[in-house]
Amino acid sequence: GHRADMAIFPEPSNFRIYPTIKGELYFKLTVPGKSTHICNRHLVAQPLPHGVERPGVSAIDNMLKYQLAILELEKQWNLWRSNEHVPPGGMFININTMQAGTSLTSVPDSAEATGSLLFNPDLTAAEVENEIRATLDRVTQSDYWLREHPPVLDLPLDSASTAPWVKEPVNLAHDHPAVGVIRGAHQKVTGHTPEVTISPFVCDANFWFPLGQPCLVYGVGDPSWGIHGANEYLPVADLIQATKPFAAVTMDWCGVAS
């Protein structure tokens, strides 16, 4: 399709310039168990005599093993995978939803967790996926029952569309000409020089940049203003004020006919 010299995504950066954006992946982990009545809990969690078949296995107990491994991986990432643009603790894994069991009187036979992760811009989605899979596989191999009944990891997790939702990082050079033009235009109109830094969020720019489209984020609003929540808002005065630097950027980048 058509390509532009530059694409500006007017996400709520509060007029900061974001040429760098972390990558993002979503996942779903389904961990099996074996259902039995709760009166058999002692036969689920404790050693059994030789020859006695274990009547049940708690999927929640098994899920906890994987969750702890994920938390440890997150810790190791932030200890050893630093990046010049990412603040400490900026590479993380978040468990967003958990569901397990169907009865108050049974050991759960399945547990499901979904989550998302943001990763440093110097990594690729494939590298991160491989590390996640290796981490979870070590848990599986350490448990006799799970070796025979491994979990199912959907990574990357399919979005509402037909394609897996993979957001690769954006790594536009901070000295790219567009950054200078936006800084200059903003300073000319407002009297303030905007900060050039890494975005705290991902956006549609993550889909465009891997396709060869130079892009960055620069816009009005702030994530603290109810974004993705109740009473999301943008002051009208700020919206009107935003038109001025955008007009200046357009004229300075594209030029004005004489």
Predicted segments — roles?
Residues 1-26, 30, 254, 258:
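Acidic/histidine-rich catalytic neighborhood of metal-dependent amide-processing enzymes
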Residues 32-258:
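Metal-dependent amide/peptide-bond hydrolase catalytic core
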